Amino acid sequence: MRRTLLAFLLLMLIIPAGAHPWKPRHYVIIDSDGSIDDLKAICMLLASPDVRVLAITASDGYHKAPVAYEKIRTLVDGLWHQGLPVAGGEDAARLIEETLSAETTPVTFIAMGPLKTLSEAMDQSPKFNEKVKQVLWTNSGLPGKTGLNYRTAPDAAGKVLAGSVPVIVTGAGGDGFYNQNMLEEIGNIHTPYAARVKDLINSMPSHSFVYTAFDEMAPLLLHFPELFTAAETDNKGIYNSPADLNGLRQATLKILRGETVERMQVFKSMPADTSFYMPDLQPFVAQIRNRYGEDEWTSGVIGNELHRHLGVYAIIGVKMGIRAREYFCTGVDEMMVTTHAGSMPPLSCMNDGIQVSTGATPGHGLLTVSTEKPFFAAADFTYKGKTMRISLKKELADKVSSELREINFIHGLDSDIYWELVRQNSIKYWLQFDRHEIFEIAAVE
């Protein structure tokens, strides 16, 4: 009977991870004092498709809240997440309440500094005890009275530890975490999050703490609790010490690669071997993947297969959808989309790319094609009550449109030469069009 029960519980753990790969297991609010290990940890949380960062608050700690806010806002904007809510000071508790009120999934509150903001949120946010399932705090031990995060706000720490929400603590034990081999491995990961972590470390090469993992233990514990040793304390909390540093190093690389969920539904991954791709595309495969990331590459391949030919507007739609997900810091199947590309090719081919890159399909009830004229290369993306319009810059839209008209005029749609030239153009723009440069983004009231 006991074996049967254990098997059932294990099955329950496995099924959610495999049945809904587009829905992350961890919805989090982060509170940070803006220190360098906080910023590295935030990069890790943003890199993981198994985490949805709902909001970040800035608090007094290593830095004062206004300085922490600027560091965090600069970080997330530099990672193209301009739509991710960040607040500090008196606005922090308000943002926490707004975020919890809008979220239906239980939330983990990750505190990577003193607990003053968290303590205030417990008082000021009616939804806190209802929506927050656990607090994950980084501190040197538990109660950890010698730790900076405890000493900065001891009364707040005592209040949180005595509260009704479970508190899990980690932090110490990561000295010398970023060794030379680790830095080389991070340098070989082609994601903006890995690049930013390496930049942060290289910004202070003479400071030993920059090579230490402290707040980074929070995302590691969230994803890989089996690599820690847990011990209950007298404070009703659990302290988690790193048990396998080499394993945690490999786990960090896995997070920075975005390998925390199975993204595909039929095959495991897109082939890395360029011989799997058509000869005319082979010379550009590595460049496109490394420059724009695995999400854009995978969506581009699937989108063009769905489309049944390589088309520049389908590729523009892929890039537009990925850019929208970046902006809101969200995943697939989480946005409502209204496209303004109409239903007439070639412009309407953009709709296919948007569907693949966002998961906003008619079958999911998330995609609407506007019938309002004139049609143009743009779409409205709505997430958590906020709508942003992303439009292809006019000069680029005019250029793409005129090129296609010219090819059509000279060769005609029934000509093999027409489709070959369209294919060549599509590969060219797939490589040349940087989604961070080709679009205009504006709020829709």
Task: Please provide the spans of the model-predicted regions.
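Short, motif-level signal for alpha-helix interfacial/capping segments enriched in acidic residues
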Residues: 13-18, 289-292
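N-terminal acidic, glycine/proline-rich low-complexity segments
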Residues: 20-276, 362, 443-444
